[in-house]
Amino acid sequence: ATIIHAFDDSHVIAGQGVIGLEIIEKLPNVDEIYVPIGGGGLVAGIITAVKEKNPNVKIIGVESSAYPAMKKSIENNTLETVSGNTTIADGISVKTPGKLTYEIVRQKIDKIVTVDDSDIINAMFLLMERSKAVVEPAGAVALAYILKHKPESGKTVVPILCGGNIDMYLLGQIVSKGLSGMGRMLK
């Protein structure tokens, strides 16, 4: 059997880079791309492909504030392990980034930011309500950041939305919290 690492593998990184190529092809004037970060495979692939085609595009990585492993690693200029906390974004709850992904991200990332669970819930609710799209919590962090920290007017920004692995009970809780937060549900 061949074991392929979920994020710290050059083939996985290259495959995920295709997303970046597609963005550049469809939106050649894109200014910023916001990418979820767990172990770093997705952002490493996208950043490699995009920066090769257009080094002026800003790549902003987004982590859960409960697991800021890549952010801490970049800030301290060494691979870091975080203890982590509870988060609904379990798909990116990675304690230590990959060695290969860390090196790529360290050299090319423009910025890494974090979001809280409440921001993620708001983004997921908005996606479901307005776009009828269900995205897992880990895949909604990029939009969560954009919604909370509005990009500069006139900028073309792309949030990467990915994954649909979500428990039905959690999905129900997110809808309930979203409706309650908007004053549209009595409890």
PLM-predicted stretches and their roles:
Residues 1-187:
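PLP-dependent amino-acid enzyme catalytic core
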